[in-house]
From Swiss-Prot:
GO cellular component, one term: photoreceptor disc membrane
Stretches in topological domain Cytoplasmic: 31-42, 103-121, 194-221, 278-287
Stretches that traverse the bilayer: 6-30, 43-65, 80-102, 122-142, 172-193, 222-243, 256-277
Lineage, uppermost ranks: Eukaryota, Metazoa, Chordata, Craniata, Vertebrata
Name this polypeptide is given: Rhodopsin
N6-(retinylidene)lysine found at: K265
Gene field: rho
Length: 287
């Protein structure tokens, strides 16, 4: 790999930091500054911003530094730290999206009568979020698989590449695929799918008034953007990781894993734009 590729990665990470930090920090600041935004639902949105800041400060800065050097210069400890923060931040963000999807489904579709999303429910959602994220990020630190430099050796991730006797890589990869990708994806599709159906049913029952038509358009737009952003960010990375895992021993170019891994990092920019900037109250407070 020539030096221009590493320079490109370094510039890309700098761009993510340049955009990701202020957008997520502004999200935190505005929500904490304005009392009307401190609602139970926004606790989850704040958690999303915290997760993105974890990725920016704990992962992106390290990756930019190592990209500038052309390899991972920070040793085993640095690899563990970078891999942990990147994985934890990504998983917190992912499970925040799941909690948001479940909350929206319960509120809009009303499968539980007279349910009101309270501060206690939000705290429970945050606790569940951190438990699931930690269940993914901590095992490689304690011997269940491990974090290793991947792709162009500028960032670290869980070892999909080898079986590594004694580290049980296979079981962790299967756990990650099922528990930390397929199940969240199913939940998100289910919740927003049911939400869209509920809006359509309400529109039909009310003979499609202007209000319900507008609500349907807003929900549809939110569903499409949410699903596309999730798939765009994570499906390439998950697919390539699974392909490499299923073809261990084969030769793969360093760019093969680098591109989807670095592309997935762009989720730190998409999240606040979708879940905060599309909220008119948050947007007005920011202005």
């Amino acid at each position: 790999v020539n030096g221009a590729a590493y320079a490109g990665l370094c510039a890309y990470m700098f761009l993510l930091i340049l955009v990701g930090f202020p957008v997520n920090f502004l999200t935190l600041y505005v929500t904490l500054e304005h009392k009307k935004l401190r609602t139970p639902l926004n606790y989850i949105l704040l958690n999303l911003a915290v997760a993105d800041l974890f990725m920016v400060l704990g992962g992106f800065t390290t990756t930019m530094y190592t990209s500038a050097h052309g390899y991972f210069v920070l040793g085993r400890l640095g690899c563990n730290v970078e891999g942990f923060f990147a994985t934890l931040g990504g998983e917190i963000a992912l499970w925040s999206l799941v909690v948001l999807a479940v909350e929206r489904w319960i509120v809009v579709c009303k499968p539980i009568s007279n349910f009101r999303f309270t501060e206690e429910h939000a705290i429970m959602g945050l606790g569940f979020n951190w438990v699931m994220a930690s269940a993914c990020a901590v095992p490689p630190l304690v011997g269940w698989s491990r974090y290793i430099p991947e792709g162009m050796q500028c960032s670290c991730g869980i070892n999909y590449y080898t079986r590594s006797e004694g580290f049980n890589n296979e079981s962790l990869v299967m756990k990650m695929l099922i528990c930390h990708f397929l199940i969240p994806l199913f939940v998100i599709f289910f919740c927003y799918g049911r939400m869209l159906c509920a809006v359509k049913e309400a529109a039909a029952a009310q003979q499609e008034s202007e209000t319900t038509q507008r609500a349907e358009r807003e929900v549809s737009r939110m569903v499409v953007i949410m699903v596309i952003s999730f798939l765009v960010c994570w499906l390439p990375y998950a697919s390539v990781a699974w392909y490499i895992f299923c073809n261990q021993g084969s030769e793969f170019g360093p760019v093969f894993m680098t591109l989807p891994a670095f592309f997935a990092k762009s989720a730190s920019i998409y999240n606040p734009l979708i879940y905060i900037c599309m909220n008119k109250h948050s947007r007005h407070c920011m202005i």
